[in-house]
Structures are given as structure tokens and as C-alpha cells.
Curated annotation (Swiss-Prot):
GO terms for cellular component: cell septum; cellular bud neck; chitosome; incipient cellular bud site; plasma membrane. The chain crosses the membrane at residues 213-233, 248-268, 506-526, 1068-1088, 1098-1118, 1123-1143. It is an enzyme of class 2 (transferase). The gene is CHS3. Residues 1385-1394 have a biased composition (Basic residues). This is Chitin synthase 3. It comes from Cryptococcus neoformans var. grubii serotype A (strain H99 / ATCC 208821 / CBS 10515 / FGSC 9487) (Filobasidiella neoformans var. grubii). Residues 124-133 have a biased composition (Low complexity).
Amino acid sequence: MSRPHLQQNVSFQDTKPPSRRAGRDDIPPRPPTKSDPSKASLTTTTTVQSVGGYNNHQLDFDDNAYVDAGSSNPQGFSDYNGVRRKKSMVRPERERIDPNHRLWHYREHAAEDQVDIQPSSTGNQPYNQYNNQRPGANLRRGKSLLARETDDVDDSSGLNIFKRGATIRRKASRATPRQAPTGAQSNRVSAGQKEDEECCCLGNFAPGPKNCWMIYCYLLTICIPGFVIAKVFGKKTPDAQRAWREKIGIVSIVLYLMGAVGFITFGFTQTVCGDTQLRLPGGSANTGSLVINGYDYDFSTWRHPVAGDTFNGTTSPLYMDQYMAGGMDASFLFQNVNQNCLGLITPASGTGIDHDGDQMGWYFPCNLHDQNGTSAANLTGITDRTNCHVSSYARSNFSAVVPTAEIYYTWDRVKDESRNLAVYKSAVIDMNLLQWLDDTQVSYPEFFNTIKNRNDSYAGKDITALIERAGLSQYARCLTDVIQIGFVDTITIGCIMSELVLYVSLVFILGAVFIKFGMAVVFGWFLSWRMGNFKGESYQERMKRAAEIENWTDDIYRPAPGYLRPNATGTARTGVKKNFLPTTSRFSRAEPMLVSSSRPSTSYGMVGETRRQGSSIYGNKLGPPAHTTPPGSPLLRNSRSSTSLPFRDDSRHSISDRSVNNNVPCPFPLGNVVPQPAPDFEPFGYPLIHSICLVTAYSESIEGLRTTLDSLATTDYPNSHKLILVICDGMVRGSGSKQYTPEIVLGMMKELVTPAEEVEAHSYVAIADGHKRHNMAKVYAGFYAYDSETVEASKQQRVPMVLVSKVGNPLEVNDAKPGNRGKRDSQIVLMSFLQKVMFDERMTTLEYEFFNAVWRCTGIPPDRYETVLCVDADTKVFPDSLTRMNACMVNDHEIMGLCGETKIANKSETWVTMIQVFEYYISHHNTKAFESVFGGVTCLPGCFSMYRIKAPKGERGFWVPILANPDICEHYAENVVDTLHKKNLLLLGEDRYLSTLMLKTFPKRKMVFCPQAVCKTIVPDTFRVLLSQRRRWINSTVHNLCELILVRDLCGTFCFSMQFVVFMDLVGTLVLPAAISFTLYIIMISIIPQSVTGMPRPYVSLVLLAFILGLPGVLIVITSRKIAYVGWMLVYLISLPVWNLILPAYSYWHMDDFTWGETRKIAGEVKEEAHGGKEGTFDSSHIVMKKWAEFERERRWRTGTASRDSQYFDVVQRANSPRSGIPSNRYSIVSTSETFNSGLGTAESNHLFRQSQSFASMSQVAPSPETNYGNVPQLALPPPRGASIGREHSPSSTESGTSNNYAYGSTEEPTASNVDPYYQPFTNEVYQDEAEQPILPSEYTTTSPEPVYQTAPARVRQPSQRGVSLVDTGPVRSAQAAPHDAVRRVSRHQRRSSSKNQLVSPISSGGHTGSLPPGAAPPQY
């Protein structure tokens, strides 16, 4: 809750402040200053306007509530910000919920239950009748994750909920202070203005958003005008030209990164450590060189100039017998005189050395000495200048010679006690050479005599500090000039930095490689066989199964072993638990529908006792009235899986049967559905859950579709718990096919619930821009029809199947691909449908027909399904894969998605398929295995993966929507794709983006890899198709990693986190061309001899390369023991230039190509186009959106089975109530199954059903009696209860012989004498645990018991809405969340025991009202 704007002192003493949602633009109040005169008086208060039905509150606070804004406070708050609540790392309830929050849309959907009005159907903004304020005005729908904006809706449209532009109404409402628009409207208005306005001096240079990135791309390509792009590069439209400019921007970043990698690899060392000369250890100079003043000079080919009679210009002193100078130290022949020693070494009196004052010609005798320091002092010819090279000519010639190397000495040699060496700074001096000074010829300091003989104070040490402290630095510099023999073995700071960068990079790269390798080994040895494993499965059985899988994957058409595919006629009940003692008796209640599962129910009701309830021996069959139950009936919402149908296997009654007294035909005949097994039927050791097998089809062939559907239909998962759903993306024909893809699929169906010729197309909101946002589709429901040539008759199971065929809107009848909206749209058809079912939101006519189709072919309401298996239409699934994937889901509720292993069926077809075998293998068993250890698989392949629709939460029956989460559906259903980033995410890499969305929305849940689940597929066999496929994959990978790198909540921290791994993957993917080029370069210079290259061998790089390329082979050997894959690895290594150079480079340059290229070819298409283009204007008037209950009311009214008034006020009279002749005063806002076919007074009446309590019968909220019902559009309020309903009562209600003392408006309650003994009055339970209490507003709280039969009130009651329900229960009041609880928990109604003989209604609330579905959290500020 954000604070109100404060003008004076307030205090927070009242317990229930008004609840509101903070807007994104809300500004926290400034705290009062110390000079504020109101500070001294705490009696002044500020009245806050009542909101949401709460009373007005007076708020004030004391002196210590705020710190002075102008003072410096110790907490570190800025002077102008004041006190603000900071985000906490350990208190998630304190995090600020803004439109960028990962659960923003989910909380918005949950908070909408608090709004006191229904969504508008006219486009007018609704107002609160109490204070003229729109409830929920502070609710901000927020921006899309990808900043979705659009303004393409026709102004004359009737459904303005799709409006995103700046309409006149929105502008007017924005200008009116008291009618502030919602956050969604304001966001869309501002965004619409932003796209149209010009950007500084650049003008309107590109369509779409003009952010810093687009400005950079435009400036980078400003020298290339649009007409050049259109003529040369073929980009005609402004959107295509924008994508081309963005592509150039991304290519520039790739080049920057590759240049940076190349500089770090090669240039950095040369830059910071490139001036280092060749270094030779002291004493290692060869006979072809001389050592002079610490440097080695190569004189092997040098000839001494003509000098007297000794040298004639063709001889070298190195090889003359009188010199033999090769390998000697000739420093005394080229002495550094009169520099640092000037004034220190002076001529002695009577010296024979040439001198001029203090300047001398030489100091030492000009003789050679050994480079190892073994020569004794030789003072011969000290006055002879022949060898001293003192002339300027000799000195200039010597200076022209470049030294070959530096002579260096290690510290071990410096400390050699046989020598008298010392180090000054970096120079090594031989103090024994001072003995060559003749004191009769030169004068020198006494310090030289101190050190010329070995002195432990100086010898073998670094004397730099000692010399500096003693003030003898000039002496040391002089010694460096005359007796330096080399340099100490040191390394420059640049070389240190170079090596540091090298080894740090090595550590990170090898660390990542070894950690990934180690985790993959851990996964392969300890985790992989546990995932999806069945209890009691031995190691030998697992190895046998692995061998059978390898044989199975050799051919795409090879069937799996017969024993793994169950027989169609099998009725094995091996998993049924048997009890020694009987569980029923003749006194047991006849409740075949009320046997609950051991797992929590999929419906929202009350959490009650979890003990199993057996069926009575007298109640094995249900009467026909119970068989006419429509979807959403209370008969179907008490268990998760085992009691979804109103009959048992031993019941021979058809649901479409009619009773003698019930002549109304059942609208949903279910006589041919697959029976549901017993609740304790666990053939695989875990409770069964309902699964949808989603197959997205586009232009596949008959063989490909048949292969996929056969494999799904013959899986060993029970048919009662699986549904095959095929969504055909448009009326398209594959290349060479004579039939449209929907026609092919429809030919594979039988026993359609509605004849194919009678199926009509229904509208829905598609993922597109322009008029294509309106799409139409047909829904066919039936059973899968096998081909006896592909599946033997004994294996042909009866599997329900639904086909959704997109046929397009009337404007695209003549298009090449009518109805085609992309694979993402096909997935959203299902995801959006599941979300609307879970949240009881308005749905389109297609989704309503979809709901009924699922019900009619399965007998299972769609909200019962928990998982969805996504399979491409060219994939064949191993028979037990679905079972093993569901086992992972059931055993670990934290898993929200998983994928199996995809194997190649055409391994040896061409060289193109051969190079892909190991790539597929290592991507699963190395990359995904490593990510699975941490529960963060970043990419679940769309060809074979499973997602969790909803997850159980706790032990009280709560559910958390996962795939059906509004945040995931909202972001995944992005319809305006106007940037290169969004196009690569949503048009090419939709499967990977869905994985990214789930990780961003639920970073603490798991995405895992299940190697036990296996499928096989056909990979591209030509390089052209492979190039097109990998272009899509690589580009989508880059953009998805960019999204995933922003997720901060992944496991780990800093460098030891999945976020850092994602960053390394991103950089590694972008620099792949440079990496393979550098690899080839290193291999080449390693092969070429060092004498030719002149460079040392890169051993570190070679070791790194060996680990990177060799560890996958080791992984194969120690985990799978499939030696054949080592051969495939060698093929892969040979093809590395293709994978790392050709494919990435091609992909980056074609990043603005958003088509599927050669992967999917269709007939009749000249040039393929992407799905993101905008054509025309979207007119939403063609789309009708209502809640399921409203559709159902209208259907029943149109078929004449119920009056129009019955949709507002019904008396529910149960067919099998204890006293069928006494009508029940159960008031319902909907026409339920019991009012549709009550069947009172029939011979089948019994005590099966519990007395149901509806929301309407318990709601304590009523509108004003003066409400004008005529002005309420579409979702009109019910008429007063005293009004005539006009509904014909059932025969039993009029012929029962009992007077109708409980008609509408009656105030008389039944007495104990006229109530059946089996009737148990409803009472409000007293909750002992605070966590069990439903969260109720104060005005709803009741403490006294309430009888189940209530008299009809004088005016219509508004029903309350609770959790997820498939009925329209009307508006509700705002509920106050517990201040200490960050998560809003809405308890389901406690299921009463069978002895109370009651059945929970789908709209039952048990007398309590909540406003948020399970797991929803109110905003916390």
C-alpha cells in the first residue's frame, strides 16, 4: 500500500487503511520538515476518501515517523528523496510490484476479482456507483515484456479491450483528473505518441520504437540511404529496411566482440609485453657471439674492418688464434667511461692511461675475460690502447650493431657462493671484476675495495635498498656502467598482466569446461536413471531398454518392441491396490462419483478429509439424470483423475440415455468416451494425471503425421488420461501433397461427436497485426483412426482426439495460406484457453467450442489437465516416454518443464546427417545434463518437451498456474513484432522463448532433462535445408540468451551462477567464427617448425583445445559406454568449420530473414513471407467474448431447454435428493446441470448427491434496490427474486403431491419435521488454524451457523466470485489480505465425508467468499 500524499501530520493507527494499488508513476510523499508548524501539533488529521467499501479513516503520525528532508540522516537517504522503503533480498513480500515484475500480470488477474463491476462490453469506462470512482482505477496492466504497443484497432469496433491506440475517449479521460485512465491505457497512449513523434534532428527515420539502439543502428548505416537498401539488398518496405539496419548494428557488435577476443588472444600480449628481447641465461652464449655489458652480440658472420696489420677486413677476431674471442666477455674492449663514473674513477698520479683531466680513455685493461667469471685478473697492457676502441669511428660502428639477446641470471646463480654477484635494480654486477682496477693507474673510492672481495653484506643480494639508504647511489650507477654482466631474471609489469589475463582466462574456460563435464557425469551416473524411472526397474532392464532404443532409432518407420506397446483389449489391473478387509458394506453410501484421489483435486473447492471413500454395493450405477451433466458440473470437480466421469467401468448406462420423466435430449452425449479407472489405479507406481498431447502441424506429409500420431496413440499411458490435440496452422498443402494438412488429419479421425460437414468456423484473437488478428478455426472432436498397415489391430487403442483447424478470416480466402499465423499462435490457442478456463475469464466462441469438444470426447473438463506434451508433426515418440515424463512431473511438483532426448533416425543417409549425430547427442548429454543438475535447462526443444499447466501448492489443494499463467500467456502472445529482436524471438525461436519466459517468471522452479524419455526424428539431409534450419536456431539462440541474461534470480552468484554461464554461452556463440579461425591458426603454427615461424609453440592454447574437444569423448565412454558415438565425434570434429564458421556467419548476415526457408515448403507459394507483417486494420466486432457460463446460458435458451430468465435466478432441484418431492431453495446465478435436467421424482432417485451450496445462496452483498436493470449491458444483474421467472417446473416438482411452500419469495423455512433425516444443515466451520481461514472482508464474516435452506430475499443478491470457476458468479467486494502474509491463500471448501451425503458444486463456496485464486498475492508496498 503506498502512502497518500500528505499535507500535514498523519498517523497510521487505524487497523484497516483503504486498499489500493500503487501506480507506476506514483510519487512517494515528501516528509515534513522540521520547520513545518504542523509538526508541533499532532491533533491535525487528514481525511482519506473511502475506497472499496471501507469507512473513512483518519491518519496521523508522530514526530519520529519521518526524518527531516533537509537534514543529513545516518541512514544514507538523499535529501530530496526522504525515507523510502528499500527492496529486501530476503522478504519477497516487500518487493515493489511494478509492470516489470515477473508476476505482474498474474497479480493483475488475481486483483481483478476485487473489482466490483464486470468488464465493459460497450467500450465506455465504468464508474463506481458509490463515489464515481472506478474500482481498480489504480490497477495498472503494465507493458508487455517486449514493450508491446499497437494502434491498429478500428475505432468503430465494439470490443475496445483490444484498443491500444490513443483514442479521443482515452485522451479525454486522461485530461480529466477524476477519471484517470488505467495504467494500460496511459501506457498505450504515451507509447502511441512516442512512435509517431520525430526523434531530435533525425526526424521520423524508421518505423517502430526509436530508442538508443535504433539511433545507433541508423547512425551506423546513415551513409546508406533507403533507396540503396531497396535496390541493392531488396528491402522494399520500411519495416524490412529497419530490420536490415538493426542487422548491421548486430553484425558490428559481433565484429567488435571478435576483435576483442582476437586482441586478447594475440594483440594484448604483443602490446603490453611485446618489447621484450630474446633472453639468454648467463654463460650460455655460443662461440659465434660476444657478451658486451650484459648483451649478447651475434658476430658469427661479422668481419672486422681494416685495422693496421692485424685485420685486413676479411677476418674475424672470434676465430683468430691470437684472440679466440668466441663466447668471451668483451665488455672491457668497449668500456663506458666518463659517464656515471666521472669524478669517481680518476687518473692516478703518474698514470700511463690517456686522460684529459678527470676524463680518462679507459679504466680497466682492454682484455677479454670468461663469461662465467672464472678468469683471473689480467692487468697486462693496461696502458696499451690497441684493443680499447676509444676512437669515435670504432664507437659509431659498435653502436650500429644491434644486440641479439639479453643475458639474464636467475636468483640461484646470483646467490652462487663461488661468485661475487649482486643486483642493483635490474642489473647484475660482478664485483670480482673490480680486482682488474690498478690503483697505480686509477684512483677509485674505498667502497670498491670493500666489495671487490666477497662480502656477505652485499654478495648474492639485491643491494638496491642498502645503497639507497647509505646514499651510495652514484657508486652503484658507476658500477653498472663498468662491471655489469647481465640482468636479473625478471618480468615486466606488462608481461605480468599478459600472463595474468592468459591464466585467468584459462581458469575460467577450463573451469567451465570441467564443471560442465563433472556435472554431466554426475547427472549421467546418479540422476539420469532416477528421472522417470519405475520402481523395481533393475540395471539390466535399463540397459536392455537402452539397446532397444538404439535399434529403434535406426529407422523412422521401425516400430517399438511389441511388449512396450499395450494391447487395445488389455484390461490389466496390476497397479490396483487390493485390501484384505472389505471397504464397503450394505450401509455404505452409494457415492460412485465421490471417491477422491490421493492427490489434491484439480478443481477449486474446499479442502477436506483425504481418506478414500468406497462406493456402495447399491450405487454402482447412476441414473440417466446424472449422465446429462455438462462441463463444469459438480459431479466432475471432486477428484483429480479417477472420478471424472459419472460412471464406473461396470456401469452399462449410457450418458446419453433418457429417463422416463426426462424427455429433454442431452446436449452433450458421452456414451462413447473412454471410462475412467478406479481412483487407486496406479499401474506405474504413481497417481495418474491427465495430459494433453499437443501436435502442431503445418505442411507435413501424410507419412509424417501418421508416424507421429501412431506413436502418441500407442503409448502405454492410459487412454483415459491422455488427449491428442492437433492444431493445424492454416489451410496449407505441403510440397507435393494433394490434400490440405487439416484434411489429412481429419481423415485420421473417426466417431466425430459432430459430423464434419456440420462443424462451423469460430472466431478468435490470433497473434498477428492488422486484420489477420481476427482468425477463424474449426474444432473437430472424436477418436483417432488407425491405419492397419502401420499399427496392428491388437495395438489400436481407443484414444480421444481433437483437431483445431485454422481456416482464416473472410478477407484471406484467396491467400496462399489462409489461417496461417505461425506455430506460436497454435500454442497460444491452447495456452490462452487453459488460462481462461482456470481464471474463469471471458473466452471466444472458438474457446467455448473447444471446451465442449474436449468434454464430449473425453468426459473430462479441460481444467483437469495438468501437463501438455508438445510434439512436432515429424517426431515419433517411444511408447513409454509420456509415462516417464509424467512420472517426473508427479514425483517433483517443482518441475515446470522437461524435455526428453531426441535421436536421429537417418544417421547415415548423407554426410549432412552424419555430422549432426554427435551434435544432437552432446547437446543433450552434456549441455542439457549440466543445466538439469541445477534445474535450469535454458531450451526445451519444441519437437519433444512437456510443460506443467498448473502445479499443486501445499497440502490444502491449492494450485499455481504455470503454463496457463497470465504473465507467460501475455508475453508469449505478443502480436506487434516490430523490432529485429522481437522478430527473432517470436517468429523464429518461439520454443526457446517459451522456455526463457518460464525461467523468467518462475526462476525458482525447475526445467530439467529426462533422458529416459526418447523420441526420434528426421534431420535435414541436404546442406541447403540444414543452413536454413540452423539460421533460425542460431539467431533465436542469440536473442533468447540476451533475454535470459537479464534474469537475476537464477541459481548461483557472480561467476558461480547460471547467469554467468548464460553470459559465457552468449559471448561464445557470437564469436564462434573468430574462435574456429584462431583454433585453426594455433594448430597451424604448432605444426610448422619453430625455426620457420620464429614464435614459441602455444602449449597452453593446445592444452585448452585438447580439453575442450576431448572431454566430450571421455564423457561418452564413462557415461553411456556407446563407443559408436566416439566415431560420430570424430566426424563432428572434422566438420567443426561448418558448425563454427559457415553456419554462424551465414546466420548473422541473414538475421533479418524471418522465414522458415527450405525447412517447410508448401504448394502454391511463390515467395515465403514472415508472420509479423501488418495488413489492414483489426476489427474486433467480429469476435464475441463471454464467460463460459454466459455462452452456456445462451445455448440453453436458444435450444429451448431453459428460459432466458433462468440465467439469472434458478431454483436448483436435485434429481436424487433425499426428498425429491420437496424443492430446494438453492438459488444459483447460472443454469446448472441440475436445473437443466432435474429429473425429480424419477425411479432412480437416491441419496447419491450432497446438498450443494451456491455462491448466490450465501452471498451477503446486494445492490441497491433502485438499480436500473434495463441499463446494464450484457452482464445484466438478476431480476428481483419476487419477480416471475417464467420457468416451467419439472414434472416431479408439480406432481409430487407436496405443496410448494418454498416458492420464490417465501419466508418460511423448513422445519426439522419436514426435512429428510439424511439432510445435514450447512454450518460455517470454525477454523482452528489461522492458515485454514479463508480471507474474507469484514462485512462477509459470519460466526453463527447458517442453514442450508434459505428463504428468497426481497431483492436479488449478487453472487460472489471465488477462485477458479467455470461460471459467472458476478462481482465481489474487495478482500483485505492478512498484513503478515505476502501470498494470498484461498482455501478450497472442505469436502464433507460421505456420511453427510453432499456433493460440492463447481460454484460452491461453502459460505465463504474470497477474491483471489489460489496462490495469488495482493500487492505489497
